[in-house]
């Protein structure tokens, strides 16, 4: 993640901080921790961005809670998460973009999960690319795993769709192509999606 310059200022601003926010370094300077009275933002040189706010208040609010519908609240939460993701990806100078993957709701809590996309193809790693947890309008936690990719120039054959579909069992309904981690590289692969009802 960005550690200096306007990319850092934009990222700090997305989380409600300024360039003058108190910070300290951890892990031999590879992690910069920004903090105020209600929240903490950790920026790791590896690209890991972690935000957490206390239960009582929040630095980042998606909307004014006075008079809003559930649908409008979700739209505002998505907009808030997207603004933060855009700032993080600019700060990290990545060549990827984010795509909403899942929305989980439980009472007042909403969790938004995003996939990382490279050239329009999902990149599947060991953990979700980005997760945002809102408690009503307040952003409680956010985790973003920024990565840069460099094409190797190699080619890899992915099983043709018709051949893959012919081999599908009844429970396997959809086909998806994605980059998956393999031997320290991300390689394209095709796999089946199962119906959630089965």
Which residues fall in each region the model found?
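Preferential activation on post-signal-peptide N-terminal prodomains/segments
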Residues: 1-79, 83, 87
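Short, non-transmembrane alpha-helical segments in secretory-pathway proteins
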Residues: 2-16, 67-107, 151-187
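Exposed beta-strand-loop-beta-strand "reactive/processing" segments of non-cytosolic proteins
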Residues: 8-47, 95-138, 144-147, 177-198
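A short, surface-exposed interaction/processing loop segment used at functional sites
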Residues: 53-69, 138-160
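Generic hydrophobic/packing signal
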Residues: 73-77, 122, 139
């Amino acid at each position: 993640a960005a550690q200096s310059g306007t990319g850092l200022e934009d990222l700090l601003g997305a989380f409600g901080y300024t360039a003058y926010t108190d910070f300290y370094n951890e892990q031999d300077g590879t992690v910069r921790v920004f903090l105020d009275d209600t929240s903490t933002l950790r920026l790791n040189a590896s690209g890991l961005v972690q935000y957490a706010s206390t239960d009582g208040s929040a630095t980042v609010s998606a909307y004014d809670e006075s008079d809003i519908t559930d649908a409008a609240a979700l739209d505002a939460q998505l907009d808030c998460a997207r603004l933060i993701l855009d700032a993080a990806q600019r700060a990290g100078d990545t060549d990827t973009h984010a795509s909403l993957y899942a929305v989980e709701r439980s009472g007042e809590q909403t969790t938004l999960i995003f996939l990382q996309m490279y050239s329009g193809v999902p990149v599947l790693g060991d953990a979700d690319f980005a997760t945002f947890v809102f408690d009503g309008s307040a952003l409680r936690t956010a985790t973003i795993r920024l990565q840069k990719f460099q094409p190797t120039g190699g080619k890899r054959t992915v099983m043709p769709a018709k051949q893959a579909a012919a081999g599908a069992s009844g429970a396997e309904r959809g086909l998806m192509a994605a980059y998956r981690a393999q031997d320290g590289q991300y390689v394209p692969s095709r796999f089946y999606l199962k119906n959630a009802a089965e």
